[in-house]
Amino acid sequence: MELLISGYGPAGRENLVKCDEHGKVVWADTVESPSFICTAGDRLFAGTENDDYAVFTAYVKDGDGYRKTDSLRFDGVGCLCHVCYSEKHAMLFGACWGSGHLIYATLDKDGKFHHAGKLLQVNETGDDSLITRAHFVHVNQAEDTLMVNNVGLDIIYFYEIADGTVREKDRIYTERGQHPRHSVYNHDESLLYVVTELSNEVLVYAMPEKKLLQRISTLPEGFVGKSHCSAICLSPDEKTIYAANRYSESLVYFRVGADGLLSKVLQEPVEAEKPRHMILTKDGRALVVCYQVAGEIYIKPLGADGLPISGAATHFPFADAACAVDLG
């Protein structure tokens, strides 16, 4: 297993790392507070999360590691927490939780940034108590539509991607206070699964109609208290949805029915503190869980049924663990 892992913290320490499943480092670099990373082909991108500005950093594969090709700073935005890349348009997108901005830039063949832009998702609700907080970006398979989840406004925005910019074309309004954090499509994009940070649910939408089909809790039965649902994954065979809860400190496993609707099959306590991010390996055979507060990466092997194999989890330390990518 080859992983890329990022961890919060100042520049000067190795906080962007390529390693194996035991944490053995193959390559490392230092970037200021790399909150989220993504890859596309031979390219690697990292986003710097700072209260007062954001930075895109681009790399290209070089031997067993990566070589930095460029970085781009955006002023007047804050807390860049998620990035994604469109190969078709050679565009990198980022969601800024602190300021509510969508930021983007195009990339040339040498990995240099140009034609940068930013868009503020304005609070148009009339409720001044709401604060715009863009938190998630995702490009669809056709790479003609960008989805942006705004947890503060309880809106999922859809933008047309064209000519190095974006134009809004549609929205999903979730219920006030749900806070749609992250989303995942099924393979043919006929269903959209949305995990909500504050209501701690998975919402299931029929697409492209954007019709709500189901809402199901991610919390342990009878739980009362603070909880923030943080991550969602769909297995490659589309039979299992995984979600992680912070504060209530649990992982939850849902079986996906033939109709795409969910039923809970397992809830288990986490091994460390506050699972911030979670991915499935590309083969669907393991969960990789980033525990930011605990500073740990846990790898949880899964059985043929998509459920964790008892006693098989392994882990290694990683300071302020924020994000992981499976390189296959």
Residues of each region from the PLM?
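Asp-box/WD-like beta-propeller blade repeats and closely related beta-sheet repeat scaffolds
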Residues: 68-138
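Blade-loop segments of beta-propeller domains
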Residues: 27-89
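Short loop/turn segments immediately following the C-termini of beta-strands
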Residues: 8-10, 49-51, 97-99, 107, ...
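A short beta-strand motif characteristic of beta-propeller blades
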Residues: 23-30, 68-74, 117-128, 167-173, ...
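Beta-rich, blade/repeat-based domains predominating
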Residues: 31-41, 75-87, 123-143, 174-189, ...
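Loop-centered beta-sheet repeat module
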Residues: 146-200
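Short loop/turn segments immediately following beta-strands, especially the blade-tip
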Residues: 59-65, 104-114, 159-165, 205-211, ...
